Swiss-Prot record:
Record GO terms (molecular function): hydrolase activity
Protein name in UniProt: Esterase LipQ
EC number(s) recorded for this UniProt protein: 3.1.1.-
InterPro entries to which the protein is assigned, alphabetical: AB_hydrolase_fold, BD-FAE-like_dom, GDXG_lipolytic_enzyme
Organism listed in the record: Mycobacterium tuberculosis (strain ATCC 25618 / H37Rv)
Amino acid sequence: MHIASVTSRCSRAGAEALRQGAQLAADARDTCRAGALLLRGSPCAIGWVAGWLSAEFPARVVTGHALSRISPRSIGRFGTSWAAQRADQILHAALVDAFGPDFRDLVWHPTGEQSEAARRSGLLNLPHIPGPHRRYAAQTSDIPYGPGGRENLLDIWRRPDLAPGRRAPVLIQVPGGAWTINGKRPQAYPLMSRMVELGWICVSINYSKSPRCTWPAHIVDVKRAIAWVRENIADYGGDPDFITITGGSAGAHLAALAALSANDPALQPGFESADTAVQAAAPYYGVYDLTNAENMHEMMMPFLEHFVMRSRYVDNPGLFKAASPISYVHSEAPPFFVLHGEKDPMVPSAQSRAFSAALRDAGAATVSYAELPNAHHAFDLAATVRSRMVAEAVSDFLGVIYGRRMGARKGSLALSSPPAS
């Protein structure tokens, strides 16, 4: 009986791997086409694009998707490695540094579910965090939020049992891709799956990309998406007064910039009066200072100059400074949880360390930083023990911020029962 059960799970895992592999192959094909377009204009970008491809589309992604469908408990057994233990310790320390040793008592989610880590007294003992898979309700994918066609579409992830009277907190996911390639799928699935399970609504967006567009079109679209969410998310059960944002790589740059430049009319042409503030940000392995070439991959500055900014840094340093989130740090910044891999070959972790330090120096009230040992760029794409631990830690961070907003209430209301009027 046990053998039959394992065989069945492995069979389902194989089918899932094929499906995910087909999707990833399609994404990689689109990426290669975009990369070819980039390289046509600048052979010097070969190293940058090749490195990005190897980081964003590794074979382990497909394997991780497959393993995630077999048995979360089985996967958990592999989490006792030194690297997983170190990641657990660092994530825990980052949250303790931000909120104190009893931070788990402050976590609150719409389901009222206590964090898995709190119940099991440690991230390594997680009994279950869902594998990366999309959770859409009817008519919640490819929704237009702006006039940009395919580049202005978003997906809404939500629980199917979310009651009409509910107002769930919202997390916006901004995809990475060197400001030039990739889209709203298949990034951040471990995190969004977890947040949806906890009763949140997640919104994954596309945005305009280079070389077809020039900076600041990218951030304008992200802010347009925030404005759309604030105006419309209540129709899908979301709370327009509690919006948070995340993203990886270029998406982290855009998420951080959006979080720090709320309601800046220069970045909101045509919708200057829209409220684009967010309540928290959790950027992964991002670029936060576009003026510091010493803290970049050697090919990043020429890449930015040629494809994204369409201007040389020496000719227009103000443009690069204005595009850098580190230029916008201030004492009223929303809470930040900054994450980076120690061995990131594409974006040095020094970018995140300097950014976190700048936030603290500016007087920002809540800044948490976790640098994960042995983690590379795009470490969260695969459904590994580490990516799931990171998702759980981010959910705890956002849960504390949400708990503050809700008056740090304990207990819960049933997700399927709207609040009493």
